[in-house]
Amino acid sequence: MRLLLLLLVAASAVVRSEASANLGGVPSKRLKMQYATGPLLKFQICVSUGYRRVFEEYMRVISQRYPDIRIEGENYLPQPIYRHIASFLSVFKLVLIGLIIVGKDPFAFFGMQAPSIWQWGQENKVYACMMVFFLSNMIENQCMSTGAFEITLNDVPVWSKLESGHLPSMQQLVQILDNEMKLNVHMDSIPHHRS
């Protein structure tokens, strides 16, 4: 029983340290270009979906074409319920692996007979631990993946993969930015009358 308590304390300490260093899968530093002073182009992307390379390529091309634009990128967070499920699975996975390794039967604690899968896990500890680890990681990744690639210019949405269902091509993005920049220049040139 003491060992189980020790495993729970250790697992919660690991999760807390991971959460403070990497809140909900968000990279601890934002991806940004700080030397530009113009309008802010902000990307919110699903890093676990592999969109980081796409963002970096777009950032490179846009910074060459529009040197005055400030570009920021950050992870698009999933809904809180999915983040909590992923956090719970992370702790549960560690506790379950610890119980398998130690050989403690948690079902005896509740006065239940151990199911056959638990007995199989005790006979095949390495396979059982690997299966728990990979299955849990698969579910955690599914919970944390949003599929998002959202782009805003000065907090005005210009592209949403969640709405459109696909990433913008480089030509589409450049055309959108050209139109937005022309509109901004036009709006700035209109004299403002006070009433």
Curated annotation (Swiss-Prot):
Keywords: Endoplasmic reticulum, Membrane, NADP, Oxidoreductase, Redox-active center, Selenocysteine, Signal, Transmembrane, Transmembrane helix
The name this protein goes by in its record: Thioredoxin reductase-like selenoprotein T
Principal location: endoplasmic reticulum
This protein's encoding gene: Selenot
Phylogenetic classification of the source organism: Eukaryota, Metazoa, Chordata, Craniata, Vertebrata
Family: Belongs to the SelWTH family. Selenoprotein T subfamily.
Pfam families listed in its UniProt record: Rdx
Post-translational modification: May contain a selenide-sulfide bond between Cys-46 and Sec-49. This bond is speculated to serve as redox-active pair.
A GO biological-process term: cellular oxidant detoxification
Transmembrane segments annotated in the record for this chain: 85-103
Recorded catalytic activity of this chain's protein: [thioredoxin]-dithiol + NADP(+) = [thioredoxin]-disulfide + NADPH + H(+)
